[in-house]
Amino acid sequence: MSSRTLEYTVPPEKDGARVRSVLQGYLGLSAGLVTRLKHRPGAVRVNGIPARTIDIVHALDVIEVDVGDARPGAFAPAGPALDVAWEDEDLIIINKPAGMAVHGRSDRHEPTVGAMVAAYLGTNAPFHPVNRLDRGTTGLMCAAKNGYMHERLRRILHTDEFRREYLAICVGVPEQAEGVIDVPIARVGEEKRFGVDPQGAPSLTRYETLLTWNGLSLVRARPETGRTHQIRVHMASIGCPLLGDRLYGRACMELDRPALHSSALRLIHPLTREIVELNCALPEDMVALLPGKK
């Protein structure tokens, strides 16, 4: 079993505190994760000695906690090679290919992003995607390597510490070259379809038209919320569905998927405070649709 150990020296003001208090208040572990650690012998140590979460610690005591969640066992074949854009001990950012689901169904034997990451890391640990991408969407996608980092990243996902940009090719030209689409989204019926609904979840997307040609437009979209199919639903709501989007627009011969690409990602690393800023070029199938490329 692989591990990821965090270390913390108790400051004078926490003298007499319980281990649980330090883990939650200073290291940012959730109550659920602390509870799970209680059932893993040796996961928490104070000055090198196994400790309980209810134990008292004193100033200058060193607390070590293993937040790794890898487990032994075979992992499924991954399929295509993983395109890694950035990684460290706690997180990995990949360039996701088109036509691949993040998670697989038990009745489908097909490559998934989760299986690709498992094979790359050589582990059968739980997969922790942070910004999920639809099957047809390409580009930058972040995943945590352990449950602790997943919790930390999810807390900042829709804040200024985790910003995402997408490029989309739309059918039609937005009436306003740039703007904000601020309309709620909800599931429509029993289908895997969503739509604008006054009773739905608040949803906001900022967009900017970069290029127009032959009734199409290249749009940069910045979602500030994370609803399922948000950009697809929002662009369709202003009369500009994504090219190739069978669900919210119509199919096309040029592209067999929605023309959507996760093109930029900027985050502040929850542990190191390093600024991670990445850009990802348009995939070939979208580049081929731009003016002058045919």
Features from the language model and the residues they span:
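Long C-terminal interaction/binding lobes of large macromolecular proteins
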Residues: 207
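Short, well-ordered beta-strand micro-motif
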Residues: 64-66, 220, 266
